[in-house]
Amino acid sequence: MNFIFCTARCRRTVRQKPLVSLCVPVYGTEGLIGRFLDSILAQKDAPLFETIIVNDGSPGTKELRSIVKTYTKRFKERELPLVFLEHSKNLGTLEARRTAVNAASGEYLAFADPDDELTPAALRILYDAAATSGADIVHGKAAVCGMEDEPDARSASFAQKAQSVYEGVLTGGEILRKFIVEHSYSSFVWGKLFKTDLVQKAYSEIPFTYCTMAEDMLLYFFTALYADKYIGIPDTVYNYRINTGLTSRRQITDLAAWQKVCSASSVFTILFSYLNDHPAVGSDIREAVRDLGRAHYADNLKQLEICVVPSFQEEARAMLEEWWGIHN
């Protein structure tokens, strides 16, 4: 994997090492990242943090570089480190986040998408909760924006999941169980703060994988598996904009776009492989993973029927079956 540093970290002493690393993958959302970066610059009373932007081979690379160059000056004026990394080709959201995690120097890290925003006190609220509780996962609430343009049942269901937080403390095995078996809170990685070494450990279980769908669930499965303490808080820390990113349900007119949808199957290939190699994992968790796999496959079939143009429905179905293999 090739990437280059386009913006060096601002000089700082050991004492100025950032406490939080904000990891931001970018692909095709250059037109929206300015609003996101403004929300970062507007953070109030935040701990020292760095922002790591990963250009995942975006078709708008030239525009993105120009925007980052402009914002670099503003970040430097605030003495906020800004790091810009690039993949030479599109590797998918999971791998773009991995690149950011590997570059992170903060004790904690957070994920964000460039078409969303942080609320003004998000980083302070999340960090304070981590520091006072000792939790290695802090989960805040998200507000879902854009529902007025997407009033359908699917959007409403997504909004409900995005706002789902277990308000309280979980420890040990209950962290994973409450998420994957009881569905007590969401697995979206945005709106959360993590111990950096915890996420790095989670990534060590995940082989290189092209994945742009369900990647949050894959990463969070292993993060929750290894976490010692989770705390959910009532504060809204994230503004999610529905129907602006890769997960939006739009008409699919080529096989490259359809491949991104099918990539959800990679998540379950990895999870099933892990479960096969670790027989001690509880039967309730195994069944929950199987149920999620069935649900994602069913959703892919629905997308095939609704979103894929008729001219290549047959090819798209063959691709879907090839990606899912024995899991269909």
Show which residues each predicted segment covers.
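C-terminal subregions of glycosyltransferases and related glycan-biosynthesis enzymes
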Residues: 2-17, 213, 232, 236-328
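Acidic donor-binding segment of Leloir-type glycosyltransferases
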Residues: 37-86
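Short aromatic/hydrophobic "clamp" motif used to bind/position activated sugar donors
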Residues: 109
